[in-house]
């Protein structure tokens, strides 16, 4: 939902990775918070970026190819993060040189391991595959992500934005600042 919120305001994060996601506690019900907006940018609906920003193992192929890109690069990063969470390793080997990681990201197919895939539902892999499309126009949109059957199975996916009026904890802290 955080990416939906950002994208609905025209904000592209451009550096989504596990290090930039904070869990509010260690339970399965923990809220997730996005951090580090240093590379983020506000763009219009049809606007494209050209700056080569992001962390190599999580950056979309179009960024590595110096092509204009849009908010869909954040969705590629979500696909990489999801792959990492399911498999325990990055899809494009981070043990190689940076040049080799970039080449793999742009040219190689996603290396799905059938043994690992058998541990999860087919919907999980369809979800990951929809995010890790090399061509941005084939990649899932944020609306497709939120409507995906695997995501809809999750117990806790809030369907509305939070603000100081709807979130008592947030409201408490912001009211002290006013």
Locations of regions flagged by a protein language model:
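Catalytic-loop of the protein kinase fold
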Residues: 7-24
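Conserved activation segment of eukaryotic-like protein kinases, specifically the C-terminal portion
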Residues: 50-62
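Conserved catalytic-loop aspartate of Hanks-type protein kinases
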Residues: 74
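Structural helix C-cap motif within protein kinase domains
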Residues: 87-91
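Conserved C-terminal C-lobe helix
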Residues: 119-132
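Terminal C-lobe "cap" of eukaryotic-type protein kinase domains
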Residues: 133-158
């Amino acid at each position: 939902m955080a990416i939906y919120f950002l994208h609905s305001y025209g904000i592209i994060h451009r550096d989504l990775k596990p290090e930039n996601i904070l869990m509010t506690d260690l339970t399965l019900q923990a809220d997730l918070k996005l951090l580090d907006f240093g590379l983020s940018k506000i763009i219009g609906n049809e606007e494209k970026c050209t700056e080569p920003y992001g962390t190599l193992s999580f950056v979309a192929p179009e960024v590595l190819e110096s092509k204009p890109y849009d908010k869909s690069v954040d969705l590629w990063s979500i696909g990489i993060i999801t792959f990492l969470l399911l498999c325990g390793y990055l899809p494009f080997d981070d043990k190689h040189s940076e040049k080799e990681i970039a080449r793999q990201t742009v040219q190689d197919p996603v290396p799905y391991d059938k043994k690992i895939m058998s541990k999860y539902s087919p919907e999980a892999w369809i979800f990951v595959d929809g995010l890790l499309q090399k061509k941005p126009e084939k990649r899932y949109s944020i609306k497709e992500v939120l409507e995906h059957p695997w995501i809809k199975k999750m117990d806790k996916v809030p369907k509305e934005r939070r603000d100081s009026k709807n979130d008592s904890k947030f409201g408490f802290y912001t009211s002290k600042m006013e």
